[in-house]
């Protein structure tokens, strides 16, 4: 017989209170497809009130026993959570920050399958930041989401205090401080881009409304599902109570791809490349800015003297990297996208190194570059590490950049016209050209 010691909450015993949160720790409590896995609460223990949870070595589940007058049953002292919650862990948790709630949509998809385990490990928000994961799926994926939750459970992450799965964004987004919106319909063969904008736009309009109603008022939202700039715009327009500044479209993967290509050409390790801006849309019109990027602190054009390659080979390789990868893999980037989501969030929760910046798709109102207001456009940003950011204001734009930035801007304006019915800006009119409106994965 192995013994694991558990601490009970200082307040009323959750084991005695049928409506307590811990009641939900019984696996897969299901209400309207909203299911909840939960660890014991933090900072609510006293060393004097302990429960012993005894585990038979050859039985499947631990059996809680009574101590200090507190009643426990096998059902309430739930499986792995009993085993992982011991006094030593509790000592460590004393210095932990207050738990934060993180929603992830498309949680049964490829990108999430990489991302969720990074979030739970502490790699993103830090080793003293406990988290609750709120996973949004659909009727299609609810079974798979249970599988995801089980894998998270089996990973024994100390910082992962709670896992909820559900299909209703109004429930899943309740009190979330971060929302990572990945779930979106992929473009199928023969599908018009306007149709994709409409189908995915509806998803992001609904999720914007739900965030507006249920999320923490200062929630930070990172839109990954494509076309991510316009989806982010739809989302923010449907969430008027949340600052527009809090919405991001993921262009960090493009930034990382650009750094990699420059490092390769210059023959340096990629950590030597800094100040990399991606301007514009996450599409083949995006502009990887080699004018302002630096290698070993020097302007790229001084280090790489083949300027034709910069203007053509480099630029195109970044714009079309996603498509090439699909050709090789047979599916779009998932692991590197998850890594870039981690990078994007870390850039907001840690101070930007002196003199450097990062790229993210943000709302253009008040931008110093003359880019049309009312778009979500990738630009250079800096953060103090408080979750917020400022636009970098003094980046040089030459004629080459200006022309290409204008093309991406025109593309986003066209996308915006296609979704006017979803942003509350009138009747949609879709005049997207066939060539200039490709996702990176469509080439
Ligand atoms: N911004 C960027 O840099 C990148 C963006 N992407 C984009 O990220 C998104 C997700 O990619 P990935 O995880 O690989 O994709 P997957 O297809 O593996 O999973 C995405 C999830 O989207 C949801 N989904 C699929 N079809 C529909 C639909 N018709 N309606 C609503 N939801 C749907 C599904 O979840 P459920 O059934 O639970 O709703 C699915 O699990 C895609 O839009 C992709 O283009 C990809 C790479 C880079
Ligand atoms: O088009 C896609 O789905 C893939 C994508 O965004 C990328 O690889 O950058």
UniProtKB/Swiss-Prot annotation:
Please give the record's induction comment.
By low temperature and high light.
Q: What happens when the gene is disrupted?
A: No visible phenotype under normal growth conditions and high-light conditions in short days.
Q: Tell me the keywords, alphabetical order.
A: Chloroplast, Disulfide bond, Isopeptide bond, NADP, Oxidoreductase, Plastid, Transit peptide, Ubl conjugation
Main location per the UniProt record: plastid
The record's EC number reads 1.1.1.82
Single GO term (MF): L-malate dehydrogenase (NADP+) activity
Reaction catalyzed: (S)-malate + NADP(+) = oxaloacetate + NADPH + H(+)
Task: Please tell me which positions the record assigns to the cross-link Glycyl lysine isopeptide (Lys-Gly) (interchain with G-Cter in ubiquitin).
Answer: 213
How its function is modulated: the record gives: Chloroplast NADP-MDH is activated upon illumination. In order to be enzymatically active, disulfide bridges on the protein must be reduced by thioredoxin which receives electrons from ferredoxin and the electron transport system of photosynthesis.
Q: Name one GO biological process term.
A: malate metabolic process
Q: Report one GO cellular component.
A: chloroplast stroma
Residues the record lists as binding NADP(+): 106-112, 200, 207, 224-226
SUPFAM superfamilies assigned to the protein according to its UniProt record, in alphabetical order: LDH C-terminal domain-like, NAD(P)-binding Rossmann-fold domains
Protein purpose: The chloroplastic, NADP-dependent form is essential for the photosynthesis C4 cycle, which allows plants to circumvent the problem of photorespiration. In C4 plants, NADP-MDH activity acts to convert oxaloacetate to malate in chloroplasts of mesophyll cells for transport to the bundle sheath cells. Plays an essential role in the regulation of catalase activity and the accumulation of a hydrogen peroxide-dependent signal by transmitting the redox state of the chloroplast to other cell compartments.
Similarity-based family: Belongs to the LDH/MDH superfamily. MDH type 2 family.
HAMAP family the record matches: Malate_dehydrog_2
Q: How does it assemble?
A: Homodimer.
- The protein's name: Malate dehydrogenase [NADP], chloroplastic
This protein's species is: Arabidopsis thaliana
